[in-house]
Design a protein with these regions (language model features):
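Active-site glycine/GP-rich loop and adjacent strand/helix microenvironment
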Residues: 1-131
Length: 131
């Protein structure tokens, strides 16, 4: 079966049942939520949701956020609080991620964060809307 889950494996950990299979540490997200951007030298670069989420950990004061990829060159970031300083720092973190991974930095648009009141069971912070 193919479930499209992105998994984090437990390093050097044996299964408690005694089987010699690989142990999962956690489910990191869905393959559908992996962003794909054009690489600087051609080709594509896959960017996993946790890589994008980490960009927000380094920005002081961010209480809530959601990132949507709408195309190869456009991200929409919903963030609270939406201040000039937060926008500059988030943009710098995302540009740094692009530089480290070697993809063309997308245009980043900012919107105020509004809590999602739809029927979703699990809140998504990183979502690929361009599929």
């Amino acid at each position: 079966y193919r479930l499209n889950d992105v998994l984090t494996l437990a390093a050097n950990q044996a299964c408690g049942c005694g089987q010699a299979t690989t142990v999962m540490a956690k489910i990191a997200g869905r393959e559908d939520d992996v962003f794909s951007f054009p690489a600087v030298g051609g080709g594509r670069v896959s960017v996993f949701p946790d890589m994008v989420e980490r960009c927000f950990l380094y920005v002081p004061g961010v209480s809530e956020f959601r990132v949507e990829r709408h195309s190869d060159d456009r991200l929409v970031v919903f963030v609270a609080p939406l201040t000039g300083e937060v926008m500059d720092q988030v943009r710098a973190e995302l540009d740094g991620l692009a530089g480290r991974l070697g993809f063309v930095p997308p245009r980043v648009e900012f919107e105020p964060y509004v809590a999602d009141s739809t029927h979703r069971r699990k809140r998504k912070r990183v979502e690929n809307c361009a599929q």
